[in-house]
């Protein structure tokens, strides 16, 4: 671009000179007319200010969210301020100089953008919404809050900013959230289903993911590793429009199904597939707790189990003919396990049986006198032997 080195100049009082000339003409006076000039110093050229005013990269035409209209982009100019100042210093006052600069022109013009604005569906996903009526209400409300959001090229989209505070004052109802590993009542419970559905749509649209965290436990309304939890105002889900054109997020509701579509402008026929792999699992165990409010031996499950696991996801981009262009690691999601808790009615203690009393020993009976022994019979006399006969 061109600049002229400032030079000193002279100024005169034009009104005073005009009056003097008029007087000389009307009086036909031919005397010399005095004209006094004043030297004015040339204003220094502030090239740093010029760089701030016109410098910068070229900018494409964009969508004005306030007016709903397409606005023209701008030509970008970048130059070395120090080198330009040296050229000016070496030049003569009033000399015109050529300052070396890099000029970048917008690749998307206003007329071109108006023809293709939000023409194509870049990515979409539908998830089924279940649960209490209050949870379903929260999902519908969050989906409505983000619907119609426009993100210009290079800009970020914050889910929390779009949804707003998930409080009672903001109109949300009590759903369920996980705090400390337990499901507890919480205002806005259920809004994570919308952020998760948006996340999967953004992956399929091949958008850049700036900030995303998985749930404590795996959810079943999106594929494993494709969920995105939020907790206003601390934990956010953020995506970036890394395309050359504005994108618009639009949500739909039908028969308890929430659909998120991302509209934009496709410049080729490529598409995305997400694949995942479970790399480890964490089993759960059963914990029994004795309680007094159940009949002895009766069981009641107070916490149902969840298997923990770690899953890795990849983003695979294919051309229009189905040929793989790229396969990049997307994220690793670690889901906790949760034990099964069973309450069991406490057994009532049984009293110890009383032992039978030990009987007193019976007294020994008085001994009877022993009978006298029978006397031995007296021996009979032996007869004399008879003499033999003659």
Spell out what each predicted region is.
Residues 8, 19, 23-29, 34-390:
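Well-ordered beta-sheet/strand-loop patches within structured domains
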């Amino acid at each position: 671009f061109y600049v002229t080195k400032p030079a000193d100049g002279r100024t005169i009082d034009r009104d005073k000179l005009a009056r003097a000339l008029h007087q000389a003409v009307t009086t036909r006076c031919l005397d010399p007319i005095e004209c006094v000039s004043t030297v004015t110093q040339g204003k220094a050229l502030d090239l740093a200010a010029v760089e701030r005013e016109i410098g910068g990269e070229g900018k494409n035409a964009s969508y004005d969210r306030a007016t709903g209209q397409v606005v023209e982009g701008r030509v970008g100019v970048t130059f070395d301020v120090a080198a330009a100042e040296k050229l000016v210093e070496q030049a003569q006052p009033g000399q015109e100089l050529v300052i070396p600069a890099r000029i970048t022109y917008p690749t998307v013009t206003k007329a071109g953008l108006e023809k293709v604005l939000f023409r194509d569906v870049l990515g979409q996903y539908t998830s089924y919404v279940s649960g209490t009526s209050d949870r379903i209400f929260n999902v519908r409300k969050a989906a409505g809050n983000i619907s119609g959001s426009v993100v210009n090229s290079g800009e970020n989209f914050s889910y929390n900013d779009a949804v707003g505070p998930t409080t009672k004052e903001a109109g949300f109802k009590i759903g369920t959230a996980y705090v400390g590993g337990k499901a507890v009542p919480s205002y806005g419970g259920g809004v994570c289903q919308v952020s998760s559905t948006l996340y999967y749509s953004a992956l399929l649209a091949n958008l850049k993911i700036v900030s995303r965290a998985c749930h404590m436990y795996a959810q079943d309304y999106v594929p494993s590793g494709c969920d995105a939890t939020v907790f206003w105002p601390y934990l956010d889900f953020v995506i970036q429009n890394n395309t050359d054109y504005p994108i618009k997020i639009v949500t739909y509701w039908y028969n308890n199904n929430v659909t998120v579509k991302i509209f934009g402008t496709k410049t080729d026929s490529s598409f995305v597939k997400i694949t995942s792999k479970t790399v480890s699992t964490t089993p759960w165990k059963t914990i029994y707790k004795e309680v007094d409010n159940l009949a002895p031996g009766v069981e009641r499950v107070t916490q149902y189990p969840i298997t923990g696991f770690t899953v890795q996801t990849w983003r695979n981009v294919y051309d229009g003919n189905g040929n793989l262009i790229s396969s990049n690691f997307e994220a690793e999601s670690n889901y906790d396990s949760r034990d099964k808790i069973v309450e069991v009615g406490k057994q009532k203690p049984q009293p110890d049986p009383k032992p039978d009393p030990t009987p007193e020993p019976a007294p020994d009976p008085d001994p009877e006198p022993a009978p006298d022994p029978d006397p031995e019979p007296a021996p009979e006399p032996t007869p004399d032997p008879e003499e033999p006969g003659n």
